[in-house]
Amino acid sequence: MQFSKMHGLGNDFMVVDAVTQNVYFSPEMIRRLSDRHCGVGFDQLLVVEPPYDPELDFHYRIFNADGSEVAQCGNGARCFARFVRMKNLTNKRDIHVSTQTGRMVLTVTEDDSVRVNMGEPNFDPQQVLFRAARVEKTYIMRAAEQTVLCGVVSMGNPHCVIAVDSVDNAPVATLGPVLESHERFPERANIGFMQVLNRGHIRLRVYERGAGETQACGSGACAAVAVGISQGQLAEQVQVELTGGRLAISWRGPGHPLYMTGPATHIYDGFIHL
């Protein structure tokens, strides 16, 4: 099986063409491939499938390193867009794809950055898969014997965003996994720790559901900006500084889609016997 190794700001992926290749991945196989000592090593596996709808170009599937399938990965979406053009699966710059929960438009720019229409952020607890009686801008949670104030939003996957004074000292490794599997998130969640520098600039670290802390989380950056704007802390255009680099996020507010722009880097192509 042929594959490519790619990354988006250090969030790394194994990307596989299932349009011209016949492939199947069991959870056990994914866990084996994701091992950084005995396998390829990656945060997520991205699979390019033929479209389920003739109006679309491809179907986009995402698997975490633990073998679980998820509905969204923003950094992966950028790598997906560059991959299908690099492999001559399409020559379009505007690429329409379906995911487990919806549709996305991926636009490859002249400098090979990728702009992703992430859709409209959804703050409805039922859509976020968060146990709450009603929509709130800020929720109070008990976790790890402390009170946590957070915002929750779905970007196609569930996110919890916590404001911190400094991401350098944020309890990502301790509080992250506790909140990820908190009883109020029955399907688990991605946990973002956001430091607001000013209305147009934040720093962010994310503990990703099924993957742990990564160098960058695209949907997490989108979620943090959406929550920050909804709480009145941020402007419509925000630079998000992650461990692996920067993303540009823009959102005009309710009724409008949110856009993410950033790089996608090809590392190498490989072949593996399964």
UniProtKB/Swiss-Prot annotation:
Is-annotated flag, keyword Glycoprotein? no
Cross-referenced SUPFAM superfamilies: Diaminopimelate epimerase-like
Per the record's keyword annotation, is Amino-acid biosynthesis included, yes or no? Answer: yes
Q: Which cysteines are joined by disulfide bonds?
A: none
List the keywords (alphabetical): Amino-acid biosynthesis, Cytoplasm, Isomerase, Lysine biosynthesis
Q: List, alphabetically, the Pfam families matched.
A: DAP_epimerase
InterPro entries, per this entry? DAP_epimerase_AS, DAP_epimerase_DapF
The active site lies at 73, 217
Reactions listed under catalytic activity: (2S,6S)-2,6-diaminopimelate = meso-2,6-diaminopimelate
UniProt EC number = 5.1.1.7
In chain numbering, the residues marked as site (Could be important to modulate the pK values of the two catalytic cysteine residues) are 159, 208
Where does the UniProt annotation locate this protein?
A: Cytoplasm
Main localization of the protein described in the UniProt heading: cytoplasm
Similarity-based family: Belongs to the diaminopimelate epimerase family.
Would you tell me the protein name for this molecule? Diaminopimelate epimerase
Give the species. Sodalis glossinidius (strain morsitans)
